[in-house]
């Protein structure tokens, strides 16, 4: 896949992703907060099409992500992120994608998610997050 690194900002306002209900997560793009203003992050797109888009609009700054969870698994010989769920202090968004394979969950006990990095080829290969304490 093609690696991406959005860097760190001051918060998250919106997450735009796409998924296929038979394969995995495709595109991934975030609207961050940068010192009180929206900052539109780069759209990290799959090499292929056929995905359903989803827009997760957070009620920033009172709503923030407390946990990211999902599944990784094998699609066409690649281990990829098959499903994502975002739990905020107000509600749960998802799951989006295929909830089978190896589950993971990343609860944030202290701090805020302020950025994402990862890799996308046909699907989201992996991702990690920047935290601000």
From Swiss-Prot:
SMART domains, alphabetized: Jacalin
GO molecular function, a single term: IgA binding
Repeat among keywords: yes
Alphabetized UniProt keyword annotations: Glycoprotein, IgA-binding protein, Lectin, Repeat
Residue windows of the Sequence repeats: 7-64, 76-130
Subunit-structure text: Tetramer of four alpha chains associated with two or four beta chains.
Name of this protein: Agglutinin alpha chain
